[in-house]
Design a protein with these regions (language model features):
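Conserved alpha-helical scaffold segments that buttress catalytic/binding sites
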Residues: 2-198
Length: 198
């Protein structure tokens, strides 16, 4: 936690790789503390292990675990950029939202509730998906805490279908729903990297 004078009253950053080898210990994002280990987080990493709204290939539900596994090699200092990203703000791993794989609405509700609790406590949520549909409940939680959002979307597709096989909530309908629900201001948002037909 940061005191008014700028000092910290709790550990900040990653587990020391010289004290605990990278292959050992709790699997958190970048070996950062869990949300329970810190008094307050500036950023909370939340896994959204959900892919029931994918229309082609399943498996994205394993994304949060794979990202955490790959993040074990992240270093506390980036020499090329000359920054120590984990020393500037308190980042903690909030674990995974208990998203049911059976129903899209139920899965999204669990993700939104978990993200809403974090955002309501004042932390920025960094979501790890999951299929693209997990963006909608994350955006809902952020908008509930901050009001309508401007969106910078880096993607090959717009994800603005109206429906797919009659379903209005899929990985390809996320941003249409977000604009329709008023949680994203389409006029103040930008999509970068688009290719293909949709």
């Amino acid at each position: 936690m940061t005191e008014p004078d700028g000092s910290r009253t709790e550990p900040l950053g990653q587990v020391d790789a010289l004290a605990v080898p990278r292959f050992a210990g709790l699997r958190t994002f970048a070996r950062l503390p869990t949300l329970e280990q810190v008094e307050r987080a500036d950023v909370a990493v939340l896994g959204a292990p959900f892919d029931s709204a994918a229309t082609f290939r399943a498996g994205a539900r394993f994304g949060p675990a794979a990202i955490r596994e790959a993040s074990l090699l992240l270093r506390p200092y980036n020499e090329r950029l000359e920054i120590a990203p984990f020393a500037a703000v308190q980042i903690a791993d909030a674990g995974d939202a208990p998203a049911s794989p059976i129903g899209v609405e139920e899965g999204h509700a669990a993700i939104e509730a978990a993200a809403g609790e974090i955002a309501g406590a004042g932390a920025c949520v960094l979501g790890l998906g999951g299929d693209h549909s997990v963006t909608l409940p994350l955006l809902r939680a952020a908008a509930a805490a901050h009001g309508p959002l401007s969106l910078l979307q880096l993607d090959a597709h717009t994800d603005t279908w109206d429906s797919y096989f009659g379903a209005r909530y899929t990985h390809g309908t996320v941003f249409r729903r977000a604009v329709e629900e008023g949680i994203v201001d389409g006029g103040a948002s930008l999509q970068i990297g688009l290719r293909g037909s949709l």
